[in-house]
Amino acid sequence: MSATTVSQFAVELKMPVVALLEQLGKAGVGKSDANDMLNDQDKTRLLDYLRRAHGDESQTKITLTRKQTSEIKATDSHGRARTVQVEVRKKRVLVKRDIGEHAPEVELEASNALQEEVSAPEVIPEPVVEVVPEPVIEVVPEPVVEIVPEPVVEAPVEVPVEEVVLEKAAPVAPTRASIIGEKELQARAEESRRYNQLREIQERELREKQAREAQLVQMRQQAELAAAAAKAAELAKNQAATQAKTSEGAEKGTLHKKPETPGKKGDKGGRAADDGKKKGGIKTRGSDGAGGWKDNRHGHKKSHKVDDGQGSFQAPTEPVVREVHIPETISVSDLAHKMAIKATEIIKVMMKMGSMVTINQVLDQETAMIVVEEMGHQALAAKLDDPDAFLEEHAEHKDVPLEHRAPVVTVMGHVDHGKTSLLDYIRRAKVASGEAGGITQHIGAYHVETDRGMVTFLDTPGHEAFTAMRARGAKATDIVILVVAADDGVMPQTKEAIHHAKAAGVPLVVAVNKIDKPDANPERVKQELVAEGVIPEEYGGDSPFVPVSAKKGTGIDELLEQVLLQAEILELTAQKDAPAKGLIIEARLDKGRGAVATMLVQSGTLKRGDIVLAGQVFGRVRAMLDENGKPINEAGPSIPVEILGLSDVPAAGEEAIVLGDEKKAREIALFRQGKFRDVKLAKQQAAKLENMFQQMEEGEVKTLPLIVKADVQGSQEALVQTLSKLSNEEVRVQIIHGAVGAISESDVNLAQASGAVIIGFNIRADAGSRKLAESFGVDIRYYNVIYDAVDEVKAALSGMLSPEKREQITGMVEIRQVFLVSKVGAIAGCYVLEGFVKRNSRVRLLRNNVVQWDGELDSLKRFKDDVKEVRSNFECGLSLRGNNDIQVGDQLEVYEIQEVARSL
C-alpha cells in the first residue's frame, strides 16, 4: 500500500472523514486533519484495532448450498441441434454476531453471495451472474457490533437440494475489498430480476414454437392423408383400365405388360419429382434437427421414408404482380432485386429474346421495361428526384421588361470562299493571316460597332470536318450570311450550310464574294442556289443577294444594311436586368488560366462573380475577357465573352445559365455527370456485345490507336470525328483519349501503355513530356492544318492494309514426251510456247483445257544441266513436285502471284 491522505482513505472506505478520524484516534494513530498523511503502518494499526473491536465470541456462519440441473436445446456452428445438460450451483453464507450490553446498535449488511458454477458438456449456455458476498461494515467507536441478517433473495428456479451447515465462523477481517454499498445490492437485485424475465420470455417462445411445429405436422399429415386417398382412387381407376386391357390382350393372344408407374423407367419427370422429395428441406438454425439429413449421430445408416404421394404440403400461392420503377439505366442485378427474383432468371429471359447479358451489365430503360413486362410484372418509368427540374422552375423573370438587342450573325460557306477575309474587312483587322493554312479552325466570335448599330459576328469553319461547329453556329444565330465565291460556285459545305440554316429557321443573306476576279460568274451562282432552294429577291424569293469583294471592300456597306434590315424585321429583344443565359460557343484548356470558355450571352447580364452552370461543369466567373483580350466586368445580351473559373472544360454547344446557389449548381452538375457516365457505359456494353460475334466471324480487325490533343474543344471534336470516319472493315482508328490542352506526362504514359500515337493539333508538349516520350519511344506528331493530320493517318492506315494478291501468267509450256525414271518419277520433255518458265514456279496442268493439277515445279533442266529459267522457243525437261500423272499433249500454264499495296 502507498501513503495516502485521510480524506482519500475515507473515500476508499466510503465513510465520513470525521468517523475515520475518531477511529484513528481510538486506534492510537494521532491524526487530526483530513489532509494528514497515512502510511502503511498507520493503516495496519487501524485494522488491528477494528479486529479487536469486533471480538471473537459467539460467531456463527450459516452456509446454504443449492443445486439445480436443467436441459436446454442449442445449435452448433453447423446448424445441428444439441441437448445440453446445465447444472446451476448457488451458495449463500450468512454471518451472525451477538449484541453487547452497553454498545450502540451497529448494522452489518451482508450481501447475498451467489456463486454459480455452470458445467456444459459442449455448448456454454447463457451467462449467469456471479455475486460475491461482501459485507458492508459501518465502524463505530464502541467495539461491540450488532449483526442483523438481510433477507435472502430467492433464486428464479426451485431448489431440489438444500444443505444447511452451522459452524463456528472465523473472525471476519473487514478489508477495503469486502466493503459493498446499498446501490450495488439494488443493481444486483435488478439484474437478477431481468435475468428471470429473460428466462421466462425464452421459455414462452419455446412453447409457442413447439405449438407451431405441432400444428404444421398436423396440417402436413392431413394433406398426406388427402393425397393418399386421391392416389388410391387413381390407382383403382388405373387397375380397372389395366384389367380391361388385359382381357382384350388375352383374347388377342398378347403378353400382359405392367403399367408404368411414377418413378419407373418410362417416367423421368416422376423420378425427378421423387428425388426432390427424398432430399427434403435442409434444417436451419433453431430447428430440433430430428429426421434431418445430418441427424445420424451414432453412425448407423438411417433409411429415409420416401413419400409416394403427391409431395409434401405446400401452401397455395398465386403469382405476385409487382410495380417495378425503372430508372434511365439499371443493372441486371438491381432489376432482379426489384422483382424479387434471381438474376439468372432475367439472363435466361433475355437469352430467349436474343440478347446475351451478364449480371453486372447495365440495361437502358426501354430494354428493362420490356424484360419486366415479359416476366409478368408492371413496368413504370421512374421519376427520379432530378435536380434539373430546378432549372425548369428557374424560369425567366416576367416582370423584367424586354429591350432591343443586337443581332447575332453567323458567316457560313465553303472553305476558302473568303468568310474570314470578309469579317476582317468589317473589323478592320487581319485575322485570316493568323490562321494556319489560311483556314478557320475554330469559331471566332466578335461584336462590331457600326454606324447603324452593333452587330455580333460568329465565324465558322468551312472545312467538312467542322460540321458540328457549323450546326452550333446556326443554333446560336439570328441571321446567316452565306458566302459563295463567284468563281467557284456552290460547293458541298455551301449546301450543308444551307441545310443548317433551314433547319434552324434562320433567314439567309447571300454574299457573292470575289466578284473582282476575272472568271467571276455571279449569275451561275444564283442559278445553282436556286436549285438548292435559295431564291433571290429579284426572282420573287426572300433571300437578298449582295455582290461583295472582301479584298477591295466592294459591297460591304450594302451587306451590313441588308443584315440590319433583316434584324429590324425580326424585332430582336431580350431581358437585360436578369440572370444571364447563353451558349458555350467554344472551350479550351489554358495552361496558365485553366478552363476558358467562349460564351455568347443570349439574355440577361453576365457579371463577375456569378455562378455559371454549363452542362456537367459549373463554377464562379473569376474573370471575363472580350474578343480583344481586355478584362470587362459585365456583358449584356448578344455579347461574346471569355469566362474563367469553371471546374472543367465544358462541351461546346452546351447551354449556360447563371444560378444564385452554388450548392444547387454543384448538385446538378454531379447529377449530370453520373447520368452521362451511366448512359455512356450502357451504350459501350451494348456495342461490345453486338459486335462480338461479328468480329469473331470476320477475324481480327487491325486497329490504329490514337490520342488526340487540340487547342480548343471544337477542333478536337472535329478531328476525332474525321479520323473515325477513315475506318473500314479491315483497319480501324481507335481514339484512346481526346481532350484539349497541352500534351502532358499522363498522356505519354497512356500512349506507352496502349501503344498509341499522340496527335497534337495547334499545341506542343512540355519539356518533361518530350523527355518521357523519348525514353518510352512514343511517337508524337504535331499538326497545324487538319488536312495534314487526316492525310498522314490515312497513309498509316493504308500501310496496315493487307496487300492485294494478283496472279500474272508468265508462260505456256507443251509436254511433247514423257520419260519414266525409277528414282525420280515422271520426267516431261517440254517445249516453251510463249513467255518463260523459272525453277520453283507455280504451274497448272491443263488437259484438254481443263485444270488437272496446281502446284510447283520440282526441277528444271536443259541438256542435263540445271537452269534457272527457260524462255520461249526452247526445249527443256522438268518434273512436277508430288505429281506423276502427266501425258503427251498436256500443257503447263506458268504463273506467279504478285502482292500489290492497297490504299484507302
Swiss-Prot record:
Example GO molecular function: translation initiation factor activity
Biased composition (Basic and acidic residues): 248-278
Presence of the UniProt keyword Cytoplasm in the record: yes
Region ranges (G5): 549-551
Keywords: Cytoplasm, GTP-binding, Initiation factor, Nucleotide-binding, Protein biosynthesis
Region (Disordered) location: 239-316
Record keyword Transmembrane helix present: no
Region described as G3: 459-462
Region (G2): 438-442
TM region positions: none
Top-level taxon of origin: Bacteria
Gene3D superfamilies the UniProt entry points to: P-loop containing nucleotide triphosphate hydrolases (3.40.50.300), Putative DNA-binding domain, N-terminal subdomain of bacterial translation initiation factor IF2 (3.30.56.50), Translation factors (2.40.30.10), Translation initiation factor IF- 2, domain 3 (3.40.50.10050)
Region (G1) residue spans: 413-420
Subcellular location: Cytoplasm
Domain tr-type G residues, every copy: 404-571
GO cellular component terms listed in the entry, alphabetical order: cytosol
Region G4, annotated ranges: 513-516
PROSITE patterns assigned to the protein according to its UniProt record, in alphabetical order: G_TR_2, IF2
Pfam family, one: GTP_EFTU_D2
Main location: cytoplasm
Purpose of the protein: One of the essential components for the initiation of protein synthesis. Protects formylmethionyl-tRNA from spontaneous hydrolysis and promotes its binding to the 30S ribosomal subunits. Also involved in the hydrolysis of GTP during the formation of the 70S ribosomal complex.
PANTHER family: TR-TYPE G DOMAIN-CONTAINING PROTEIN (PTHR43381:SF5), TRANSLATION INITIATION FACTOR IF-2-RELATED (PTHR43381)
Family: Belongs to the TRAFAC class translation factor GTPase superfamily. Classic translation factor GTPase family. IF-2 subfamily.
The protein's name in its UniProt record: Translation initiation factor IF-2
